[in-house]
Amino acid sequence: MAYNTKRFHTPMFEQMLFPNDLEGVLMEMQFTPDMLAQAVRFRQTLVRNGLTRFNGCEAQWRRPVNVERVILVVGQVESDPSLKHGVQSIRTNLGLLKAVAQANADAHIVYKPHPEVWATLQNNGAYRHEMQLWCDEAVGNITLSELLPKVNEVHVMTSLAGFEALLRGKKVSCYGHSFYAGWGLTTDMVPMPSRPRQLNVDELVAGALFSYPRYMHRLEGKVRSTTPEMPLMKGLGSWRTEPAMLSARA
């Protein structure tokens, strides 16, 4: 869990609209060549091994033929605190899907619900029908590592999927205050005047994944301080289903 020390030690994702520690790091960090090289290696390893937040499913997805633009819309759990504090006019998955569909009538729109919402979508016929009115297809048990290489754009509210898409060089549109939005890497549907600095993706990785967090790795029954590469390199196979890494802000 990442905590924001600037506002009462509350979780950072609950303080999206206020100054926070990570934003301060990204605004002020002076990135060295060694830091950026480390970030490049880490990013390339993540992408090369197909690692995402949710792993384990090997189902494949085929991009439709003769379609110029495919947009992936990624839903969230609507009770997520980041949606309470980090969005403005669009606060629901249906609202996001409608906005994307209405603004991109020429695109093939793929909707990926959050894994915890997929079962609800499957079991609620009326809700499923309403969502399907605004997309060309909905996919559930398919990983982002399978989808992202095959789409042109990703649209999110505050989902971490937008960050994962940036790691893979995709165009990302944000409809909320994500930690990775506002730095010149995304198309931002809400203003973020507190972030005037322009970053590239490796500077974002260096700040958000290396400089800001503190990592603890459980190895042989002992918890040790580490960097993000160590557990990744030591246990790629097991990390796909059982993450071996915890992060906490000191």
Each PLM stretch: what is its role?
Residues 1-250:
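Catalytic-core helical/loop segments in enzymes performing group transfer/polymerization on anionic/lipid-linked
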